């Protein structure tokens, strides 16, 4: 009786400790997401237009968002290794640190009028996005069973204020030097985000998650190959990664070229900033509701709903004339909602499909594939708009959602973990 009682007391103490740490983790991640969201929002609103202005080429303009997304993909690799070897705090601090350096380089490039240097800066700028994406997984390390999507969605939702405010601030930076000021402001907020997670994310949630298994140390040798093995063994993990990748690729491709499309209709940076802010609100604002639906009704149905929303977004935005700012905004809000369904439900499904000690590897692999696909999508989007049209890009994205939707219909027969 004494042994059983002692064991129950220890379990209760451990549960209370994990719950207390989880509350702190969510608070710190929320602060980091708000700050990081401001910087990323600034870059999203201005990047395409600045690159096009510096180069005089719409193709190079499309490469701006592609560079940032490619940077996020590349930085996800060392970030995943840091998570596996040192914990979430090191990985997130590294990502925001790279974003700080990249924003500073982009500011200097805008000041000196060098578009190659600007694109190089945006590669590093993508580190902040990589940190933001990794933060959503950090929120699930200590989640109670059946609550991963809700905890994850809180961190995604935390990006709303910053990400909506960022594009709006992009049109108010004349006093800081116009385009240069946009990236100087991003430099400052990324530095604050790095400081917040470095100081505040103690104890590390991934280390605490290993307490229940009797191992306080994080297994040190976890590569992306480990993530591939997880995908090979788990059908639900494969479905999750595919849905995440398609959702993010479609979102980046359409969103990155919408500012150029609206610019052809005479829209200024302020108007574009409002449209992008509405889009980002669609991405983040309803994510807690998306997370609740995913936990209550299953991940796959929410993923399927996300593909339907992405298809509707492609139709609405694709039919918008360059002067139709309102219609384009509606299309981008739908695009954001579809993305939210894909990222929240897909990330939760992936997390629950892998053991805790293998999660950093498969999560890092997912972010690599997600951002790599989006980078390719951004390149293709720029070429399609330059050689064909914005409606042609929308039609291609509509076709992209059809096979993924079909796969998800079939995947509903799979038992979720």
Where are these regions (language model features)?
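Juxtamembrane intracellular "pre-TM" segments in multi-pass secondary transporters
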Residues: 2-23, 202-241
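C-terminal ends and interior cores of transmembrane alpha-helices
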Residues: 97-112, 309-322
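C-terminal membrane-cytosol helix-exit motif in multi-pass small-molecule transporters
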Residues: 187-212, 407-412
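Hydrophobic core of transmembrane alpha-helices in multi-pass small-molecule transporters
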Residues: 34, 115-130, 327-341
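Helix-loop-helix hairpin linking two adjacent transmembrane segments in secondary transporters
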Residues: 112-117, 145, 155-201
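Cytoplasmic helix-loop-helix junction between adjacent transmembrane helices
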Residues: 121-158
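Intracellular juxtamembrane helix-capping segments at the cytosolic ends
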Residues: 47, 130-143, 341-354
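Helix-to-loop junctions at the C-terminal end of transmembrane segments
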Residues: 75-88, 174, 285-299, 385
């Amino acid at each position: 009786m004494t042994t059983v009682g002692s064991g129950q007391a220890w379990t209760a103490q451990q549960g209370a400790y994990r719950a207390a740490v989880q509350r702190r983790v969510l608070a710190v991640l929320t602060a980091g997401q708000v700050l990081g969201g401001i910087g990323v929002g600034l870059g999203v609103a201005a990047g395409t237009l600045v690159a096009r202005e510096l180069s005089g080429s719409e193709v190079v303009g499309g490469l701006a968002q592609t560079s940032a997304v490619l940077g996020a993909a590349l930085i996800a690799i060392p970030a995943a290794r840091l998570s596996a070897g040192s914990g979430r705090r090191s990985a997130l601090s590294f990502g925001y640190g790279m974003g700080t350096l990249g924003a500073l380089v982009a500011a200097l490039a805008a000041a000196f009028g060098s578009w190659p240097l600007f694109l190089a800066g945006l590669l590093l700028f993508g580190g902040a996005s990589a940190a933001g994406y990794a933060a959503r997984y950090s929120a699930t390390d200590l989640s109670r069973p059946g609550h991963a999507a809700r905890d994850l969605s809180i961190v995604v939702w935390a990006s709303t204020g910053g990400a909506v405010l960022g594009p709006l601030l992009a049109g108010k930076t004349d006093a800081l030097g116009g385009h240069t000021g946009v990236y100087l402001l991003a430099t400052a907020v990324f530095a604050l985000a790095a400081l917040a997670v470095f100081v505040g994310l103690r104890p590390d949630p991934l280390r605490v998650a290993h307490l229940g298994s009797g191992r306080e140390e994080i297994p040190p040798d976890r590569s992306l190959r480990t993530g591939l093995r997880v995908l090979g063994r788990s059908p639900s993990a494969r479905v999750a990664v595919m849905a995440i990748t398609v959702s993010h690729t479609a979102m980046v491709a359409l969103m990155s070229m919408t500012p150029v499309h609206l610019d052809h209709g005479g829209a200024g940076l302020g108007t574009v900033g409002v449209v992008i802010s509405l889009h980002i609100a669609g991405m983040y604002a309803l994510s807690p509701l998306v997370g609740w639906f995913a936990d209550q009704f299953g991940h796959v149905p929410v993923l399927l709903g996300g593909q339907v929303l992405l298809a509707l977004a492609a139709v609405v935005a694709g039919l918008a004339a360059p002067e139709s700012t309102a219609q384009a905004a509606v299309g981008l809000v739908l695009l954001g909602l579809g993305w939210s369904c894909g990222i929240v439900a897909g990330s939760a499904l992936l997390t629950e499909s892998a053991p805790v000690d293998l999660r950093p590897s498969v999560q890092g692999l997912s972010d690599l594939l997600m951002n790599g696909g989006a980078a390719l999508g951004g390149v293709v989007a720029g070429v399609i708009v330059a050689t064909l049209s914005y409606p042609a890009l929308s039609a291609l994205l509509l076709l992209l959602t059809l096979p993924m939707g079909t796969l998800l219909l079939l995947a509903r027969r799979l038992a979720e973990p």
